[in-house]
Amino acid sequence: MRIEDIPHIPVLLNETIGLYNDMPENGYFIDCTLGFGGHSEAILEKYPNIKLIGIDQDAEAMHFAKNRLARFGDRVQFINKRASSALEELPEDLPVSGILADIGVSSYQLDNKERGFTFESEELDMRMDKTQDFSAKDVVNFYSKEDLERIIKNYGECRRFKKVVSAIISKRPIKSNRELADILGHIGLRDKKDLAKIFQAIRIEVNNELNELEKILKNAKKLAKNGTILGIITFHSLEDRIVKNTFKEWSKKCICPPEAIRCECGGNNQLGKILTKKPLVASKEEIKMNPRSRSAKLRGFQFIRG
């Protein structure tokens, strides 16, 4: 893909930029999932005193982002690795103004058959990080019946998980996404939404996505300073539930167990405030332009340090 062909409008752009209106304007903005750099570009344009740390495990996407953000010079630094690892390595005294994580597969990754995410791909791959050895081929062909049932049921939220797993195991070895889609079609899963949930489950397992999200939240909390705003964009209910529940816990003053007769924790455990009572979602206009934005949800939290 040429740099000119990169999609220039990232998901929930206006909503995301608006979320950071009250962040400190002279520190670092950490984009945990840089992708093609669309959100970061908008932040750098709006806040001339902000410096950016752009993180992404996808070297291909980062190559494009470097070109896109080259005009900002030394205001930008890039880290090509998993966000959880990169955040752990940043100094805790770093003046962090904002943190963003867009927890989703880009349209480029989904549409590029060579990346092995699409139903039509000739490879069972689904790796965000191409240097990683473990791929969808390992999950589909070598996981036990019990482990496959676990991920299809929990990550794919599929009621027919036993039938799906039986069909997969009976046709091993499976070599391509297209072959997998055909196998699922023969048991009645022909609808794209149904197929997408099965592929989603495998992709989550390959990239350890839910554990990665939890680590991002944990490390973001460590780095946050007074006024730091954290924004998380999710694309399915499993991720959104993790973010929603984490922000809810962080906003609690009292963390005593429900059975406690009186507060014994001091009642001063609140880390900040939730900025989005309900998640921000795409407008009708954005959904028309980008149907995949329909499932995107943005939640925000601002840390308050005494």
Swiss-Prot record:
Domain of life of the organism encoding this protein: Bacteria
Known catalytic reactions: cytidine(1402) in 16S rRNA + S-adenosyl-L-methionine = N(4)-methylcytidine(1402) in 16S rRNA + S-adenosyl-L-homocysteine + H(+)
Extent of the signal sequence: none
EC annotation from Swiss-Prot or TrEMBL: 2.1.1.199
Subcellular localization(s) per the UniProt record: Cytoplasm
Top EC group: transferase
Molecular-function GO term, any one: rRNA (cytosine-N4-)-methyltransferase activity
Keywords: Cytoplasm, Methyltransferase, rRNA processing, S-adenosyl-L-methionine, Transferase
Chief site of localization: cytoplasm
Residue positions binding S-adenosyl-L-methionine: G37, G38, H39, D56, D102, Q109
A GO biological-process term: rRNA base methylation
GO cellular component: cytoplasm
HAMAP family per UniProt: 16SrRNA_methyltr_H
Similarity comment: family membership: Belongs to the methyltransferase superfamily. RsmH family.
Role played: Specifically methylates the N4 position of cytidine in position 1402 (C1402) of 16S rRNA.
Name of the protein in question: Ribosomal RNA small subunit methyltransferase H
Organism name: Nautilia profundicola (strain ATCC BAA-1463 / DSM 18972 / AmH)
